[in-house]
Amino acid sequence: MNCSESQRLQTLLNRLLLELHHRGNASGLGIGTGPSMGMGVVPDPFVGREATSAKGNDAYLYILLIMIFYACLAGGLILAYTRSRKLVEAKDEPPLACVAEQEWVPAAIASADPENGQGLLAEGGHQLAAGALPALAQGAERV
């Protein structure tokens, strides 16, 4: 069945509507005399004519509709999860303004004379010997 067969879909929806009105008891809907006995004769309340459908012939449509609903639900959840992960990863990275700010040289270092080392020591800086960098405590992370 393709989507262009609206008659079968209309029959299924009418049958579901009648079952709803009869509180789920549709056992009496197929009773009658004539060639359509046992074929699930469903009176069409909108047009006044009868549409025949074999019992259980349209059950796969209901299952298909439920499967499409759950597929859309799962797809939406996957997209929402992916979007939330991208937002978390974006928060982990420093903004470009902070990165650019860290690249600027402070004014005290820029005004220091690089040839004789004056300027930093005058402001209380410590001069390190070549190769004598302070050891960082193990496990210390930059936050």
Swiss-Prot record:
<dbReference type="GO" id="GO:0008076">
    <property type="term" value="C:voltage-gated potassium channel complex"/>
</dbReference>
<keyword id="KW-0472">Membrane</keyword>
<dbReference type="InterPro" id="IPR000369">
    <property type="entry name" value="K_chnl_KCNE"/>
</dbReference>
<feature type="glycosylation site" description="N-linked (GlcNAc...) asparagine">
    <location>
        <position position="2"/>
    </location>
</feature>
<feature type="topological domain" description="Cytoplasmic">
    <location>
        <begin position="82"/>
        <end position="143"/>
    </location>
</feature>
<dbReference type="GO" id="GO:0086005">
    <property type="term" value="P:ventricular cardiac muscle cell action potential"/>
</dbReference>
<comment type="subunit">
    <text>Interacts with KCNQ1; impairs KCNQ1 localization in lipid rafts and only conducts current upon strong and continued depolarization.</text>
</comment>
<keyword id="KW-0325">Glycoprotein</keyword>
<dbReference type="GO" id="GO:0015459">
    <property type="term" value="F:potassium channel regulator activity"/>
</dbReference>
<dbReference type="GO" id="GO:0086091">
    <property type="term" value="P:regulation of heart rate by cardiac conduction"/>
</dbReference>
<comment type="similarity">
    <text>Belongs to the potassium channel KCNE family.</text>
</comment>
<dbReference type="GO" id="GO:0005249">
    <property type="term" value="F:voltage-gated potassium channel activity"/>
</dbReference>
<keyword id="KW-1133">Transmembrane helix</keyword>
<dbReference type="Pfam" id="PF02060">
    <property type="entry name" value="ISK_Channel"/>
</dbReference>
<dbReference type="GO" id="GO:1903765">
    <property type="term" value="P:negative regulation of potassium ion export across plasma membrane"/>
</dbReference>
<dbReference type="GO" id="GO:0060307">
    <property type="term" value="P:regulation of ventricular cardiac muscle cell membrane repolarization"/>
</dbReference>
<dbReference type="GO" id="GO:0044325">
    <property type="term" value="F:transmembrane transporter binding"/>
</dbReference>
<dbReference type="GO" id="GO:1901381">
    <property type="term" value="P:positive regulation of potassium ion transmembrane transport"/>
</dbReference>
<keyword id="KW-0812">Transmembrane</keyword>
<dbReference type="GO" id="GO:0086014">
    <property type="term" value="P:atrial cardiac muscle cell action potential"/>
</dbReference>
<feature type="transmembrane region" description="Helical">
    <location>
        <begin position="61"/>
        <end position="81"/>
    </location>
</feature>
<comment type="function">
    <text>Potassium channel ancillary subunit that is essential for generation of some native K(+) currents by virtue of formation of heteromeric ion channel complex with voltage-gated potassium (Kv) channel pore-forming alpha subunits. Functions as an inhibitory beta-subunit of the repolarizing cardiac potassium ion channel KCNQ1.</text>
</comment>
<feature type="glycosylation site" description="N-linked (GlcNAc...) asparagine">
    <location>
        <position position="25"/>
    </location>
</feature>
<dbReference type="GO" id="GO:0060372">
    <property type="term" value="P:regulation of atrial cardiac muscle cell membrane repolarization"/>
</dbReference>
<protein>
    <recommendedName>
        <fullName>Potassium voltage-gated channel subfamily E regulatory beta subunit 5</fullName>
    </recommendedName>
</protein>
